[in-house]
Amino acid sequence: ALFLDPPPNLWAEAQSLLEPWANVTLTSQSRLPVLNFQGL
């Protein structure tokens, strides 16, 4: 049998609404530790 965890939750929080691309915090929430995580 193959058991798959649900995909991790991934979202970005912008520090500034006028310039959301200036300072963005990328947050990942997963049940299992992420071995290889690369930001986009």
UniProtKB/Swiss-Prot annotation:
Distribution of this protein across tissues and organs: Plasma.
Tagged with keyword Glycoprotein: yes
List of glycosylated residues: N23
Main subcellular localisation: secreted
Subcellular location as annotated: Secreted
Keywords, sorted A to Z: Glycoprotein, Immunoglobulin domain, Secreted
GO cellular component: extracellular region
Record's keyword annotation contains Repeat: no
Subunit-level organization: Interacts with CRISP3.
Protein name (record): Alpha-1B-glycoprotein
Organism: Sus scrofa
Gene designation per UniProt: A1BG
